Amino acid sequence: MTMKNKNHTAEDIEQGLTSHDPAIRRRWAEYPYFSPTHVQIERGLTDVSWGVRIAWVRGMRFTPSTEQVDRGVRDTHEYVRLAWAERKDFTPTPEQVEVGLTDPDLEVRITWAKRINFTPTPEQVERGLTDTNAKVRKAWAQRMDFKPTPEQVERGLTDADLSVQAAWIHRTDFQSTPLQIERGLTDEHWNIRIAWAQRKDFTPTPEQVERGLTDLREFVRAAWACRLDFVSNAEQVERGLTDEQWWVRKVWGSRCDFIASPAQVERGLTDDKDSIRIVWAERMDFTPTPEQVERGLTDADPWVRKAWAQRTDYTPTIHQAERGLSEEDPNIVLVWLNRSDIVWTHTHIQKGLQHPVMEIRKAWEEVLQKLHNSNDTPADACSLPCV
């Protein structure tokens, strides 16, 4: 007998669900091609085999009653209680919540702490935040349905477990004190320093900014470079643009609180990393030279070429435009077609209307329609097809 058969009769199913072998009963409980009766559900949820009970709980083929949930959250086997804690199709009663949050099994307590369809009492919050297990404390620190007291915040920010500390640092419902900020920004653990650098509830002092931008950890330096609540000085800009780590250079290249020098522009446009060349191609605080334009339009990376095709502070040559039309990436071709500083010839239009990509053909039809509407003609046109 195969469980892939969709045509089992009600008698087959009932026989399987009442088999003397618990393995068979479990397999039939997992059989997806039938709607169980109330009698079958109740019998499955009270089966002597915990494996069968789990199969029924996880089957999600019924809406449990309050009595069934009550019985499930108090089941003698922790795996069954865990399966009930993971179900999302019931709103637990206060009594059921309390039973789950005080379960002797760690995974069950964690799962209940992560449920979001109940509002915990202050006592439950305090008990969860002081649980002996760090995973439970972290789960409670990540809940957003309670307002922590200053004492709870301080205790969380100094928790012995770094993941619990990070969870508290990422909360946005408390105002950090200057002492907490300074302590966090100088923490010996770099991931804690990053988390504090990402908080937005304080304006850093110049000393804190400088210390963050020169941190030994590149991830911390990048996190500080992402902040927009300080104005960088020339030394910080130059140091950031020449950082040994490319993602730090990328963040600095995307900042808009400085005007890049010609040397910085040239260095950014020729960086070894494609993503950095893209960032610099998108900057609008410089006018590119013809050499920079040509180099960008012939870059080996298509995203760099697209970024240069989107710039409007230069007039492309007809050779550059024709090269853009021959790009393999249709998105780059469409960028060129949307430019307003190119006069397309009759040859371009005729060739474009035969393009194998439908989106490009439609774009050429729009170009042609605009010419008709404006009574203009292509540079070498003698007759135009009707669209």
What does each model-identified segment do?
Residues 2-387:
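Alpha-helical scaffold segments
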